[in-house]
Amino acid sequence: MAENALADVKTLSFERAIEELESIVKRLEDGKVPLEESVAIYERGEALKRRCEELLRQAEARVEKITTDASGQVTGTEPLDVQ
């Protein structure tokens, strides 16, 4: 079952993954979740965090920087260096 739960994380949109991650954080912060369940939802939270990071990296790779010449005229685009 745990493998299925983690597998479905790989299909979530960024918005859905972040929403679920926020829900998990809130539940853990409330401190009313039994230990075993806390561990399980923490592990899912880690998977959701990795999914969000992966989707953000993909989005960054698609962003392009607009280039201009000395007079400010647009000359094209190049990959954005986000380091």
Curated annotation (Swiss-Prot):
EC number of this enzyme: 3.1.11.6
Keyword Cell wall biogenesis/degradation: no
Cellular localisation: Cytoplasm
Keyword entries, A-Z: Cytoplasm, Exonuclease, Hydrolase, Nuclease
Gene Ontology molecular function: exodeoxyribonuclease VII activity
GO biological process: DNA catabolic process
Signal peptide positions (record): none
GO cellular component: cytosol; exodeoxyribonuclease VII complex
Primary localization class, coarse: cytoplasm
Catalysed reaction equations from the record: Exonucleolytic cleavage in either 5'- to 3'- or 3'- to 5'-direction to yield nucleoside 5'-phosphates
NCBIfam families, per the entry: PRK00977.1-3 (NF002139), PRK00977.1-4 (NF002140), xseB (TIGR01280)
Subunit organization: Heterooligomer composed of large and small subunits.
Family from the record: Belongs to the XseB family.
Role of this protein: Bidirectionally degrades single-stranded DNA into large acid-insoluble oligonucleotides, which are then degraded further into small acid-soluble oligonucleotides.
Protein name (Swiss-Prot/TrEMBL): Exodeoxyribonuclease 7 small subunit
Gene name linked to the record: xseB
